[in-house]
Amino acid sequence: MEIIDFHVHPFRRKENCLNFYPEMDDLDASGMQNQLTQAGISHICGSVLTKQPMEPGFDGLRRLNREALALRESLGDFYTPGFHIHPAFCRESCEEIDFMHRRGIRLMGELVPYMHGWGEFDGQSWMEIMDLADDYSLLCCYHTPFAFDMGPMLSAHPNVTFVAAHPGDRERVEEHIQLMKRHDNLYLDLSGTGLFRLGVLRHLVTQVGAERILFGTDYPICNPRMYVQAVLGENLPEEVTEKILCGNSRRLLQL
């Protein structure tokens, strides 16, 4: 069965490899692709990040976005880039959306506000940025948890497909479920914390349906093989597993 990892932070350089432990410091783009394909993953998506402190202004984010495009050139059909925007830089973010749209890039994120010095999804600048994303029917993957209501953003931009990253603990899972029940344009990716809890995937499928759950790992922070086995280990019907591992991402990304 094909596996699409919706949530990876790819890299060519050490500064962009978000590994936790020094034993993984020698990984490069080739090693990254080998690890992922050995886990059964045939396609990845996501934004490039850096271990370095972010400099003031939008230039640092723009460089990460260009690195994502360079990785697409080297990785070919293996990788769908995601790109960064920032509500403190409305004009630059809108220009970046236009730039990426012209190149066929439809995925914003994963957006990681705590790394980039912002924490709002409801300000005027953010809404203006998302208005343009709505015009282009883009996808927006964002880091969770957040301690504010995402409802206004979701309601105001029905043409944007929002993807919340990380199921989280039991309380957070229930918050995801309630928000997803109110907003049909909200999906959840399985990366990061949460999937190791036995039964969480089956619970999500029961509550919101398999069609709105995307496989993701958060590699290289997390071990991709563990996530593949966590999905397979739920012993869900084959057609449900197929939707989660690849079908939903393929549909949303128009692969």
State each model region's role:
Residues V8-P10, V48, F83-P87, G109-V112, ...:
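A cross-domain feature marking catalytic cores of carbohydrate-active enzymes
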Residues H7, L36, A68, M100, ...:
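Conserved, mostly hydrophobic/aromatic
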Residues F58-L139:
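Active-site gating/metal-coordination segments in enzymes
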Residues R106, E120-L214:
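Catalytic pocket-lining loop regions of alpha/beta-barrel enzymes
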Residues F20-L27, Q52-R62, H86-S93, H116-D122, ...:
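Acidic-and-aromatic substrate-binding clefts and catalytic sites of carbohydrate-active enzymes
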Residues M1-P22, R62-H84, D184-Y187:
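Mobile, glycine- and charge-enriched loop segments
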Residues H9, S30-P56, Y79-H84, R106-E110:
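Divalent metal-dependent hydrolysis catalytic cores, especially in the metallo-beta-lactamase
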Residues M1-P10, E15-H43, A210-R212, R225-L255:
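Mid-to-C-terminal alpha-helical segments outside catalytic/metal-binding sites
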